[in-house]
A protein has these predicted regions:
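Exposed beta-sheet edge/beta-hairpin loop segments within beta-rich domains
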Residues: 95-99, 234-237
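Central antiparallel beta-sheet cores of small beta-barrel/beta-sandwich binding domains
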Residues: 19, 26-93, 158, 165-233
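A generic structural micro-feature
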Residues: 88, 118-120, 226-228, 237, ...
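Amphipathic/hydrophobic helical signal segments and adjacent flexible N-terminal regions
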Residues: 1-33, 46-48, 101-172, 216, ...
Length: 277
């Protein structure tokens, strides 16, 4: 059944120009936690990425991998401000959630364990500036200590557990989310809000990641939803008692709208308390 709140246009999906994201990007920290450098090239309406890690890798040692999708800043936008890419070959599988803000590239990198009995899932959220043509690039970058302390289940519950309501009560995004811990990680239940009323996104499995180099064991979550005409990739964290969800919405049918990236903010309801700042 068509969504009454969505346009019924038969036009092709809106094209998104990825030009603004391409370039050579250098980590703003002299001792990166996850990635040191990111190269981005435009390939038609997609992007190709090559990332340099900080643990002995060279740019020549990692092949290019293409973006899965690019995203505008709104459903009517035409310029890309974000993309998602996955690299699952070799010894460094990694998922990238990337967006641009105020001239900086924000890269959230998710590293799953190589083996089921391997290390914990690791996460880093880092900021990149465009490389100076005269700069030596990554040769002066050195890795920061990347040890990760395993996140206890009680810590994850304290951080995310319970129900969270959107601070924006009038938008067309998400009304509320609820997190519950499971043996394999957690689940996230989402009550969406279309242009007329709230709607149930259902429950999705959540992956819990430990932040590289963190001293207070902060966690990040990652999940995805298939909503029929749209799929949503998201990740989230809690800062100063507020849950922040970064949402990558991709329309799968030709409705004349742009896939788009945005962030939504939530306050906790119920009895759970958060010990992380």
């Amino acid at each position: 059944m068509p969504d009454p709140g969505r346009p019924t246009s038969t036009n092709a999906a809106r094209r998104i120009d990825p030009t603004a994201l391409q370039g050579d990007w250098i980590n703003t920290e002299s001792s990166p936690r996850g990635l040191a450098r990111v190269l981005i090239e435009r390939r038609s309406d997609a992007l190709a990425t090559r990332a340099l890690g900080v643990e002995g890798r060279t740019l020549e040692g990692m092949e290019w991998f293409e973006s899965l999708a690019v995203y505008a800043s709104s459903s009517t936008g035409g310029d890309a401000v974000a993309f998602i890419a996955e690299h699952d070959a070799g010894s460094m599988p990694i998922d990238l959630h990337v967006n641009m803000s105020k001239g900086l590239l924000i890269v959230s990198s998710f590293q799953p364990p190589l083996l089921s009995a391997g290390p914990e899932r690791r996460f880093a959220r880092e900021f990149f500036r465009r490389a100076d043509p005269e700069s030596p690039g990554s040769s002066e970058l050195s890795p920061k200590e990347s040890a990760v302390r395993p996140l206890s289940s009680s810590s994850a519950v304290l951080t995310f557990g319970g129900t969270w309501r959107n601070t924006n009560t009038t938008g067309c995004g998400i009304a509320s989310v609820s997190f519950a811990l499971t043996d394999d990680g957690g689940t996230l239940s989402v009550q969406g809000r279309d242009r007329s009323d709230a709607n149930d996104w259902g429950t999705a499995t959540v992956e819990i990641y430990n932040e590289i180099g963190a001293v207070a064991e902060p966690a990040k979550i990652k999940a995805s939803y298939d909503l029929g005409s749209m799929d949503v990739q998201l990740h989230g964290w809690v800062k100063q008692g507020v849950l922040v969800l970064a949402l990558f919405r991709r329309f799968k049918d030709a409705i004349g709208e742009s896939s788009y990236f945005d962030r939504e903010f939530f306050y906790r309801t119920g009895r759970h308390t958060n010990s992380n700042g």
